[in-house]
Amino acid sequence: YKQQGLAARATYSWNDRYFFEANLGYNGSENFSPEKRFGFFPAFGLGWAISNEAWWESLQETVSYFKVRYTDGLVGTDAVTGRRFMYLDQMASVDGYRFGDQNNGVGGWGFSKYGANVGWSTSRKQDLGVDLKFFKDNLSLTLDIFKEHRKDIFITRRVIPDYSGFVEMPYANLGVVDNKGFEATLEYTQQLGKKCFLTVRGNFSWNEDKIIENDDPRVQYPWMEKRGTNVNGRWGWIAEGLFTSEEEIMDHAKQFGEGHPGQISKVGDIKYKDLNGDGVIDDYDKCLIGQGDVPKIYYGFGADLQLGDFSVGALFAGNAKADRCLGGNA
């Protein structure tokens, strides 16, 4: 689909101490109706190199560089599952009515997708950072704290019941998600000889997102509420262990269609928790059981040894605060 945009940028630096940058974007997409086609997305950044101030000179031997920076900006997206012309209804041929006993029918056309007068999904991003260098730039530290507020996220309507007759639920700008976190990088370089240098470094980052609005209808039990949880959270039943006897199976809630032919729990099967106490394990007993497979924490460390034109290095990386759902036979 077609897009059109204008962009402008202005930068200013005074005496390598004070910095300012502004970015302006005006973008349009044919995905949206004419009255919502264009969006304005500004951003700006400020910086202050404190170590370049005259009164900092006495500290240069210890803190050779100190800069504080802040950025704040708005970005937008028009990506709605790859569909063009979101604001227009789409029609397709459908099965017609049947008449008599000869399977005669009259074909017709019906709605396959409903138009939605959606607009740009926007995200406000803020970042506060500090750059530090110590001992004649041998040791450097970078810290960033960030926050993001996404709103008007494209989601299909969920409060509309199935019996309303919609073939497909329409899209709307209703989703809201918050994200926050921080990043840190530390690096140290030491000269070991005339042409020999050793550098060691490490990094750490943490982020956490939270669903603010997802258009879900009111839930029957509090553990079913997805607002306030992370986007990639894993939902399911709580495993209490394994069945150890037939008596335990008989005393436990019925699981997954028990009572029907071929549906019965056996000794050694997983026993799930009946959260609402109704004697049946079903969707009303599902809750948040995991953080999902997108890590909240990333970390790494490494080292480089340079001797003349020859260098060798090593890097170790890892992540945490994530889980995987393993399937298959044990």
Give the residues covered by each predicted segment.
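Extracellular/periplasmic, surface-exposed regions of secreted and cell-surface proteins
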Residues: 1-238, 305
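Surface-exposed, extracytoplasmic segments of Gram-negative outer-membrane nutrient-acquisition systems
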Residues: 101-111, 149-174, 209-294, 302, ...
